[in-house]
Regions:
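Exposed acidic/polar residues on beta-strands and adjacent loops within beta-sheet cores, strongest
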Residues: 16-182
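Sec-dependent N-terminal signal peptides
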Residues: 3-13
C-alpha cells in the first residue's frame, strides 16, 4: 500500500511556491528494443518542459461567427498542437523533446521541427495492445531499416496519436505510410 501511495505521489502534478505547475519530465526512456534481420533496434524518447518563449506559438481562434463558430486550434512552430484540447499548452507541460532510433551502431535523431508540437507523450508500455485497445505501437520493417512509431499522446479530451517513421539512411517523416494503389 505504501508503494502505491508513493507512486501516486510521484505522478501527481506539483505546484511550486509561485503557483506555476510542474510535471515530471522523463528523459532517455528506452521505449522499444528488438533485433530484426540481425540488426539491434532501439528507440529512445525524451520529454522536455515546454517553454513557449522558445517557440513560435498561436492561440486558438474562432474564424467563424458566434452563431456559426469555426475554431482553429493553437499551433507550435507552425503545426497544430497534438496532445491537448487544441489549446496552447501551459509552460512546463511535458513536450516531446527528442526521438533517437538506433539501427545497430547508427543513430538517427528525429528533427525537433517534427516533435515540437507534440505534448504529453505516453512513454509507458509500448507494443502492449489487445484486440480492442492500443496505446503506442512500434513497427519495424522486415529488413530492419525502417521504424514506424505510432505514439499515444495527451490525456482526456486531448488524447491522440503522433506518427513518426525513421529510416536507417537518416530520414524522418510524420507522414503516415501510403498503400500502393491497385
Amino acid at each position: 500500500m505504501r508503494l502505491l501511495l508513493f507512486s501516486s505521489a510521484l505522478l501527481a502534478t506539483i505546484t511550486c511556491a509561485d503557483g506555476q505547475q510542474e510535471w515530471p519530465i522523463r528523459t532517455d526512456v528506452v521505449f522499444y528494443e528488438a533485433v530484426v534481420a540481425d540488426t539491434p533496434i532501439k528507440v529512445v524518447i525524451s520529454e522536455q518542459a515546454f517553454d513557449p518563449t522558445k517557440h513560435k506559438t498561436t492561440e486558438p481562434e474562432n474564424r467563424g461567427t458566434e452563431e456559426n463558430p469555426n475554431w482553429i486550434g493553437a499551433t507550435v512552430d507552425g503545426r497544430p498542437v497534438i496532445g491537448t484540447d487544441q489549446a496552447l499548452p501551459p509552460k512546463g507541460l511535458p513536450q516531446l523533446g527528442r526521438i533517437v532510433v538506433h539501427f545497430g551502431d547508427r543513430q538517427v535523431e528525429v528533427p525537433a521541427s517534427l516533435t515540437s508540437n507534440v505534448f504529453l507523450p505516453h512513454l509507458h508500455d509500448p507494443g502492449v495492445f489487445n484486440l480492442r485497445d492500443a496505446d503506442s505501437i512500434v513497427s519495424i520493417s522486415a529488413d530492419g531499416k525502417c521504424v514506424q512509431i505510432d505514439l499515444g499522446v495527451g490525456d482526456g479530451g486531448g488524447t491522440a496519436t503522433a506518427f513518426f517513421a525513421v529510416s536507417a539512411d537518416g530520414k524522418s517523416t510524420r507522414e503516415p505510410p501510403r498503400r500502393p494503389e491497385p
